[in-house]
Amino acid sequence: MGMKPKMLVLINSSTGLYDFRNELLSELSKSYCIVVSTPDSGKIDLIKKLGCEVIITPIDRRGINPVVDLKLINNYRKIINKEKPDYILTYTIKPNIYGGFLARVKKINYAVNITGLGTTFQKDGLLQSIVTKMYRVAFKKANVVFFENIENKNIIVNKKIVPDSKCCVLNGAGVNLDRYSYLEYPVDCKTTRFLFIGRVMQEKGFDELYTAMQRLVDGGFDCKLDVLGSYEEDYKKKIDSAVEAGWLSYYGYRNDVRPFIEKSHCFVLPSWHEGMANTNLECASSGRPVITSNIHGCKEAVLDGTTGYLCESQNIDSLYECMKKFITLSYQKRKDMGKAGRKHMENFFDKRIIVDSTIKNLK
């Protein structure tokens, strides 16, 4: 048997790659020797266990310092020259731009993944026009550009970054229905436990959630909020005071969120923008109702009124009304919502279907 072709995967977080795409890596490693370049060591041991080689490459994820980025391009160039990959697969903005550009220049087959357009495309401005131009250059010769929702694809096509024929929209990374198996709904009790999983930051809608919770508690509704995820420093005071008031429990980042999903009644993610919110999928797959924003990347996961509720993004009143509506539901109705959510995941978000579809489109 001849040598397997080599695939280079460029990403900005080993944790994100492993948590959401380990099944894809396993499947790809049957046909390719895989080398992963990542800036962090978070989950590299687990990635190596899948049979991949790992190279640590520093990336300033949010900075826009050209000197730092030139260093990244140079590091990528060295890796490509040394590894001589047959295919390059990139995720997230900097790997997409610089990896895509180098693959194009070196005439290597490549595919890019738009896992969300972030704040850059929320408002017109200099940064948006620079990124648009960079995307155009970097994606020009891509074999395929993957998207996690239709709106992101339409933005990229309308800006004439890539033609529609090169685009492939997947339902995010999908959800592993076995790992996130149906969990029995918690026994009927008078306190409603809401759950938030994600980075505690403005763009995840945490401020709206905090205010809505406070309003519910002040209004005499018996509810609590469990928060999982790291927080940005300016939220410390807020979290501490809610913990002290007794309506919020903070657990930090957790590798395994399933025990927290199990004891929750409802998951809430009032995000401002998402590629495809994995946490919505995981909680729905586990049989929990979901309240989330009525935006692309969130709303696909919910059948409004059947598996949860959709609220307006960046709108405290709308979120408050949805949460209040949920609190007043009967135990049976909540349980039925959770079951319907599980069914919706089985029908449209099964990770196996998404992995197969990704591989089929890489050709």
Regions found by a protein language model. Name each.
Residues 18-23, 192, 196-215, 317:
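A conserved mid-protein helix/loop that constitutes part of the nucleotide-sugar donor-binding site
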Residues 44-50, 215, 219, 224-247, ...:
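Short, structured helix-loop element that forms part of the nucleotide-activated donor/catalytic region
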Residues 55-56, 136, 140-182:
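Donor nucleotide-sugar binding/catalytic pocket of nucleotide-sugar-dependent glycosyltransferases
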Residues 64-68, 157-158, 172-191, 259:
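Acidic anion/phosphate-binding donor-loop and adjacent secondary structure
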Residues 253, 272:
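Aromatic "clamp/platform" in nucleotide-sugar-dependent glycosyltransferases that forms part
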Residues 289-292, 302:
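Short hydrophobic beta-strand element within catalytic cores of glycosyltransferases
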Residues 304-305, 309-316, 325-331:
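Conserved acidic donor-binding segment of nucleotide-sugar-dependent glycosyltransferases
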Residues 318, 325, 332-347, 357-360:
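A short, well-ordered alpha-helix in the C-terminal region of glycosyltransferases
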